[in-house]
From Swiss-Prot:
PANTHER family: 39S RIBOSOMAL PROTEIN L20. GO terms for biological process: ribosomal large subunit assembly; translation. Binds directly to 23S ribosomal RNA and is necessary for the in vitro assembly process of the 50S ribosomal subunit. It is not involved in the protein synthesizing functions of that subunit. SUPFAM superfamilies: Ribosomal protein L20 (SSF74731). GO terms for cellular component: ribonucleoprotein complex; ribosome. The gene is rplT. GO terms for molecular function: rRNA binding; structural constituent of ribosome. Keywords: Ribonucleoprotein, Ribosomal protein, RNA-binding, rRNA-binding. It comes from the Bacteria. It comes from Bordetella petrii (strain ATCC BAA-461 / DSM 12804 / CCUG 43448). Belongs to the bacterial ribosomal protein bL20 family. This is Large ribosomal subunit protein bL20. Pfam families: Ribosomal_L20 (PF00453).
Amino acid sequence: MPRVKRGVTARARHKKVIAAAKGYRGRRGNVFRIAKQAVMRAGQYAYRDRRNKKRTFRALWITRINAAVREQGMSYSVFIAGLKKASIDLDRKVLADLAVRDKAGFAAIVQQAKAALSA
């Protein structure tokens, strides 16, 4: 049975990990054993934070909508209830964008929500 030499595959594996750790400080960027752990942890953080990003952006949109709606003399929860009643199907991302970029258009939507609540 011939002997297996692993130099080529080991070097390729090490190069791949060190390349992924490019830019890391200290031994995390150039020592394989430590770089491997750092890259794995970075991957875990990336996986976790891709999911957290969705929560964070939703919270940001809600904060922006709430601020814009309070300028119109209404609270966020009442506004959302009014939108549901008026059957206006705009998501929070679009509403937040309107609140920032098109104040007149957003004010019209708020008026529709108020009208639906009073009717």
